[in-house]
Amino acid sequence: MKRVILHCDLNNFYASVECLYHPELRDKPVAVCGSIEDRHGIVLAKNYAAKKYKVKTGETVWEAKNKCPGLVVVKANHSLYYKFSKYARQIYEYYTDRVESFGLDECWLDVSESTLLFGDGTKIANEIRERIKRELGVTVSVGVSYNKVFAKLGSDMKKPDAVTVITENDFKEKIWGLPVEALLYVGDSTKKKLNNMAVFTIGDLANCHSEFLVRQLGKWGYTLWSFANGYDTSPVAKNDCEIPIKSIGNSLTAPRDLTNNEDVRILIYVLSESVGERLRSHNLKGRTVQISIKDPELQTLERQAGLDIHTSITSEIAQKAYEIFLKSWNWSKNVRALGVRVTDLVESDTCTQISLFSDDIKRQKLEILDECVDRVRERFGYYSVRRGILLQDRGLNRI
């Protein structure tokens, strides 16, 4: 059976939901931010009116307001967005049980076996588009294709409120002329490497020798070559299929450039608290800590190191992340953003190898401390309990 894959992308999702609840904002440039009090708060989403002023996701509030003085800044309401995401998913699940989330605002649907009931992929896509608009009051762009990568490309090609079809017969004409960074998983770093090889479009990538790409990019080179040529065969997960968590991490763009080790240490603790809490909430612990460091020119360095024992203890994660940073960064440039991630995960009650060098009594106390902090924050809010190190710079500890 020929596959029929949809990719549904709710347009300007956060901003669209806010405008739905605040109709007076509908014709104004709007940005949704993590913090509206802090001028260094980050833009999480924006509407089309703000896009006309070249407001970008990920830039600071003050940068956005410099571009658009009339910008209306709204504090993010994640519980509301989650509710709308769930409503959209219920509509998708009317057509298929194969619905795979890609963030709150995007989903893949495999409707291959649904076409006998509901019509072809284009008909299903248009029906979903109309229902989302009618029942939820927001719009969605839908890509229709025979694989996940091209379906995602299709939903990106026409916005808002549109359906784009990419077939086996016309994909070269429709997508090979697009910039290579339009392809799924081609980020800034990979784009730069490909551009240095004179690969600027998806067609350039598709027409490279796969062996050459493997030599330059490793196994990932072959994967990207396959994507560009339409060979993606990855399945859409069933909606009742629980995908195992392989890593837990968090990253932040600092409200100002970090200029010394103590700045970095503070931000690493902020990130490690988030990572540790999420590990504990999922009943997981990990043995490998990864960090990513981005400079003001957006160049990224990634490093990792192992721990002596699996852990979800915040202070152990932070200490290892800071050790990696000290070994990896020579301060030839400032630091713009940091990320901390824990991998090599196992369930917390899994028997693991004992380290001869760990202090079990001290570790038990730290585990109890973290659990107590989690409970207090759950009841009274995140800022009800703070580590002393985070009081050294209030500009960093409130992000």
UniProtKB/Swiss-Prot annotation:
Localization per record: Cytoplasm
NCBIfam families: PRK02406.1
Residues carrying the site annotation Substrate discrimination: Y14
Protein family: Belongs to the DNA polymerase type-Y family.
Lineage, broadest ranks: Bacteria, Bacillati, Bacillota, Clostridia, Eubacteriales
Domain UmuC positions: 5-187
GO biological process: DNA-templated DNA replication; error-prone translesion synthesis; SOS response
InterPro entries registered for this protein in UniProt: DNA/RNA_pol_sf (IPR043502), DNA_pol_Y-fam_lit_finger_sf (IPR036775), DNA_pol_Y-fam_little_finger (IPR017961), DNA_polymerase-Y (IPR050116), DNApol_IV (IPR022880), Rev_trsase/Diguanyl_cyclase (IPR043128), UmuC (IPR001126)
PANTHER family: DNA REPAIR POLYMERASE UMUC / TRANSFERASE FAMILY MEMBER (PTHR11076), DNA REPAIR PROTEIN HOMOLOG YOBH (PTHR11076:SF35)
One MF annotation (Gene Ontology) recorded for this entry: magnesium ion binding
Cofactors, names only: Mg(2+)
Reactions mediated catalytically: DNA(n) + a 2'-deoxyribonucleoside 5'-triphosphate = DNA(n+1) + diphosphate
Domain of life the protein comes from: Bacteria
Broad class of enzyme this protein falls into: transferase
GO cellular component: cytosol
Annotated catalytic residues: E106
Cofactor-binding details, from the entry: Binds 2 magnesium ions per subunit.
Assembly: Monomer.
The protein's name: DNA polymerase IV
Documented EC number(s): 2.7.7.7
UniProt: Mg(2+) binding residues: D9, D105
Primary role: Poorly processive, error-prone DNA polymerase involved in untargeted mutagenesis. Copies undamaged DNA at stalled replication forks, which arise in vivo from mismatched or misaligned primer ends. These misaligned primers can be extended by PolIV. Exhibits no 3'-5' exonuclease (proofreading) activity. May be involved in translesional synthesis, in conjunction with the beta clamp from PolIII.
A Pfam family this chain is assigned to: IMS
Keywords, ordered alphabetically: Cytoplasm, DNA damage, DNA repair, DNA replication, DNA-binding, DNA-directed DNA polymerase, Magnesium, Metal-binding, Mutator protein, Nucleotidyltransferase, Transferase
